[in-house]
Amino acid sequence: MDGKDSIIGGELRSRMADIRRTEEGQYVCSMAFDPSFRGFEGHFPGNPIVPGVCLIEAGRVFAEEVLKRELTTRSVTQCRFRRPIFAGERAELKIKLEEEEKNLWKIQADIRVDGNVCAQARLKAAVL
C-alpha cells in the first residue's frame, strides 16, 4: 500500500497513531497535523488549515490500514465540514466499516478535535 500511496495519502498514513478497535466495532486513531504537513502548502498562507479533501482521504487511508487492503474511492455519498483543523492540532479519526458487497466497502468517517466534530463523511471504496 505505501508504494502506491499518493504523496498526501502517505503523509496521512504516517500521522496515524494509537490505532484501536472500539467495543462497538469501530476503529479509532489519532492524527497530528503539525506545521510540516504537506497538505498545508498553499492552504492558506499565514493561516494553514487541513484541506477538506485530505480529511475525506484520511477515512479511506485509515480503512486501508484496518483492512490491510488497497482501496480506491468510488463515491462520496455524504460529506459535512463543521470546523477547520489548524496546524498544530491533534485530531481523532473514527471509522465504521461495512462490506456492502464483495470488495465494496462503505466507510463512515468522523473527525474531531477536542471532542468537537470537524468533518463527517460517508464514502464507498472498492478493493483494488
Language model segments and positions:
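Residue-level signal for inorganic ion chemistry
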Residues: 52, 95
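Hydrophobic residues in beta-strands and at strand termini
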Residues: 33, 81, 125-127
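Short boundary/loop segments of OB/S1/cold-shock single-stranded nucleic-acid-binding domains
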Residues: 2-4, 84
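Short amphipathic alpha-helical face segments that pack within enzyme cores
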Residues: 53-61
